[in-house]
Swiss-Prot record:
Functional description taken from the UniProt entry: Dephosphorylates 2-hydroxy-3-keto-5-methylthiopentenyl-1-phosphate (HK-MTPenyl-1-P) yielding 1,2-dihydroxy-3-keto-5-methylthiopentene (DHK-MTPene).
Pathway it works in: Amino-acid biosynthesis; L-methionine biosynthesis via salvage pathway; L-methionine from S-methyl-5-thio-alpha-D-ribose 1-phosphate: step 4/6
Record-given protein name: 2-hydroxy-3-keto-5-methylthiopentenyl-1-phosphate phosphatase
Enzyme class, UniProt record, top EC level: hydrolase
Documented EC number(s): 3.1.3.87
Protein's organism: Microcystis aeruginosa (strain NIES-843 / IAM M-2473)
GO CC terms of this entry: cytoplasm
Keyword Nucleotide-binding: no
Length: 210
């Protein structure tokens, strides 16, 4: 069966939680109030993330992209993407974070053209405050990862993630690579996963398995 890889961005491709860090930087008081509720899953991602982003003035958008510019990526991504290209395996980023931040980091690394597709949150900056736009919103998520995955049927799905935004993606995937908070969530639900720390490890696992 052919394969497809779905990968989170913040804290997964980046070595630090870029999106959460940005929210703490540009909306510190509201982040301190809302983010614990999202991690505890007492507030939906859709409502919490929208509220946080739409509290930030539009004039800060350039600063947000500059904030992302300096954030390091996790080791082995370039090699992993080269491996996937050799195997003709699509690599799709699905993120609850900002599309512009994702593209900024990938351009810096020279990897933007190695990615099959990117699904993230778009921001409108014409008004006084940022306005959130997502084509993949559902009742609980601004970017409904399982809904996007459902577009790609008849293939083995591989998910790579690290946190609360990746739970629905992990539930739907045939094979899950998890780290950080996502491990705790999956253990609580008795969901199988493979722990990982860098993309070299994922490449090695897939090589040995095949």
């Amino acid at each position: 069966m052919s394969k497809i890889v779905f990968c989170d961005f913040d804290g997964t491709i980046t070595a630090v939680e870029t999106f959460a860090g940005m929210l703490k930087e540009f909306a510190p008081d509201l982040s301190a109030q809302i983010m614990p509720q999202m991690y505890a899953r007492t507030l939906t991602l859709r409502r919490g993330v929208r509220q946080l982003l739409e509290s930030i003035p539009s004039q800060k958008y350039a600063d947000i992209l500059a904030y992302a510019e300096s954030k390091p990526i996790r080791p082995g991504l370039a090699e992993f993407l080269a491996f996937l290209q050799e195997q003709s395996i699509p690599f799709i980023i699905i993120s609850g974070g900002i599309q512009g931040m994702i593209e900024t980091v990938l351009k810096r690394e020279g990897l933007l053209d190695k990615v099959t597709a990117i699904y993230g949150v778009n921001l409108h900056t014409q008004g006084e405050y940022l306005q959130v736009h997502s084509d993949w919103e559902n009742e609980t998520e601004l970017v409904a990862k399982a809904l996007i995955m459902a577009k790609y049927s008849g293939v083995e799905t591989i998910a790579i993630g690290d946190s609360v935004t990746d739970i629905t993606m992990a539930r739907r995937a045939d094979l899950v690579f998890a780290r950080d908070r996502l491990i705790d969530y999956l253990q609580a639900e008795n969901q199988p996963y493979i722990p990982w720390d860098n993309f070299f490890e994922i490449r090695e696992y897939l090589l040995l398995r095949d």
